Amino acid sequence: MHQVISATTNPAKIQAILQAFEEIFGEGSCHITPVAVESGVPEQPFGSEETRAGARNRVDNAQRLHPQADFWVAIEAGINDDATFSWVVIDNGVQRGEARSATLPLPAVILDRVRQGEALGPVMSHYTGIDEIGRKEGAIGVFTAGKLTRSSVYYQAVILALSPFHNAVYR
């Protein structure tokens, strides 16, 4: 059984990680241990590079806390231009897989507050009345009318980031 350290305690992110690992390696093939670690970037990262750095830092910090795991996984959400997205970083101590999620354009009223220094989650909670929306369906669920959720979009990115770990062409 794969021991997977999730560098987050966010249920939406953990669900995506578990589903993706089970899709690739088989149901019941992994045990997820969530840990809270620092990203080393602002609470609301801006730009692709800052967001990817946050995910990489989380993986590195999780490896230091739990060096005996098989995989370390981080998902860092950020804002780039007028949209939200995330970076997924997966490491197994030998190689690293990274993938960027789909991008969701955000309304100007939301972006204005985020650009003034507020994090997306609390701004979305204010407009929707959904407490801790970032730990649930997220802005993605709201603006796609539930057709996609934060977890479902992250799932795809985790699948992509796992590609180097089960395809011999990458080795």
UniProtKB/Swiss-Prot annotation:
Name the Gene3D superfamilies for this protein. Answer: 3.90.950.10
Biological processes per GO annotation: nucleotide metabolic process; thiamine metabolic process
InterPro entries assigned: ITPase-like_fam (IPR029001), Non_canon_purine_NTPase (IPR002786), NTPase/PRRC1 (IPR026533), YjjX_NTPase (IPR050299)
Query: Top enzyme class of this protein?
Result: hydrolase
- Which residues are involved in binding substrate? 8-13
> What reaction is this protein's catalytic activity?
XTP + H2O = XDP + phosphate + H(+); ITP + H2O = IDP + phosphate + H(+)
Residues that, per the record, bind Mg(2+) = 38, 68
This enzyme's EC code(s): 3.6.1.73
Which Pfam family is an annotated match for this chain, by its short name? NTPase_I-T
UniProt remark on cofactor binding:
Binds 1 divalent metal cation per subunit; can use either Mg(2+) or Mn(2+).
Q: Which cofactor does it need?
A: Mg(2+); Mn(2+)
> Which HAMAP family does this entry report, sorted A to Z?
Non_canon_purine_NTPase_YjjX
Give the UniProt family note.
Belongs to the YjjX NTPase family.
Chain's role: Phosphatase that hydrolyzes non-canonical purine nucleotides such as XTP and ITP to their respective diphosphate derivatives. Probably excludes non-canonical purines from DNA/RNA precursor pool, thus preventing their incorporation into DNA/RNA and avoiding chromosomal lesions.
Q: How does it assemble?
A: Homodimer.
Identification of the protein by name: Inosine/xanthosine triphosphatase
Species of origin reads Salmonella paratyphi C (strain RKS4594)
Q: What is the lineage of its organism?
A: Bacteria, Pseudomonadati, Pseudomonadota, Gammaproteobacteria, Enterobacterales
List the gene name.
yjjX
